[in-house]
Amino acid sequence: MVLAVAGFTNFTQDHRDYHDTFEAYFAAKSGLFDRVLGPQGWAVINIDDAKGMVLYDACRKRGQSCLTVGRSIADLQILGQTFDANGQEILCACQGTRYQVKVPLVGGFQGENLLLAAGMVLAAGAEAEALFSALKSVTLVRGRLHLPATLSTRAPFAAAYAPTPASVTPASAAL
């Protein structure tokens, strides 16, 4: 199998338990780009992550096209996020145009992941205007940091599947 587009969100402790070392873990993640992504493929990379920059450099050296995503200067740049009890509003810039999207996703990391996925769709050939219009209809995945109820004290009750101790921290911080 050869992929046309692959995405890199981040390099964290989340799945480290499957690998003997961090180096082995990064080599496994990098394998998606150097063994499965085709030479003419698109690498969509979060460049706010230090390992994202390492991966970006490696993909460019192989001649793969790269689309960058992040808060720093990027092809798809996150300009701001505002949060409320129903989700977040994301302001971003892509191809010289600003887009504002309201989505029912709790937590900054979910907005960042959404934009990385959007970058993958753009790399696959979608038109930006149609894509950002479609993002407005995104729905949340139950169990992935959603707010199914409000307690009698008016405090929100959150449900989040966090498979490792390392994944509890960003979920907790998002609330």
Describe each PLM feature range.
Residues 2-156:
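Acidic, Mg2+-coordinating active-site environments of NTP-dependent enzymes
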